[in-house]
Amino acid sequence: MYTRPLARLIEELQRLPGIGSKTAQRLALHLLNRPAGEVEALAKALLEAKQTVKHCSICFNWSAEDPCEICRSPQRDPSTWCVVADVKDLIAMERTREFKGLYHVLGGLISPMNGIGAEQLRIRELVARVAREKPQELIFALSPSVEGEVTMHVVKDYLKPVAPGLRMTRLAFGLPMGSELEYADEVTLARALEARQEF
């Protein structure tokens, strides 16, 4: 049906999250209709991002510099950290403009059904960092799901021996159970951050 280069482009676009065959086809045809300079700029931006953007060695945010801008900023409060599952959750929290502390990106949530255990996440790195930097509070901004709950409690158990006095809070529930944090609007997230609770 498609010439081979077009079929390959559609196939590659379909690998992206949330892109089905119809959307991939629409994007591919759109790209073919654009001027060559625009398509080359997109290709260059993709390659440059892939080659230069790496995980921050401290918090595991994506950054072209190490440490990332957040970890380097003297305006951030080093006594309060927000623990998130993924960088997209960090971005969601930053959009609220309410959180002024530092972050730690776990790299996912514990999900035995998907073969993801504590050892696949950056829990050891968090424990070492907490022991070294001694924050006063960790705010868990994990999606309100079974996986989020399990992850929170496992991390808490890992941290107890190294930081017995550490205050650990979670976002208040204005977020529906089973929802994804990245899809929450800024106002809901800001209110959940304000009304966080000990757990």
UniProtKB/Swiss-Prot annotation:
CDD domains, A to Z: TOPRIM_recR (cd01025)
Disulfide bonding pattern of the chain: none
Gene3D superfamilies: 3.30.60.80, 3.40.1360.10, 6.10.250.240, RecR Domain 1 (1.10.8.420)
Protein's UniProt keywords contain DNA damage: yes
Zinc finger extent (C4-type): 56-71
Residues spanning the membrane: none
Family listed: Belongs to the RecR family.
UniProt cross-references to NCBIfam families, sorted A to Z: recR (TIGR00615)
Protein name: Recombination protein RecR
Species the sequence originates in: Synechococcus sp. (strain JA-3-3Ab) (Cyanobacteria bacterium Yellowstone A-Prime)
Lineage: Bacteria, Bacillati, Cyanobacteriota, Cyanophyceae, Synechococcales
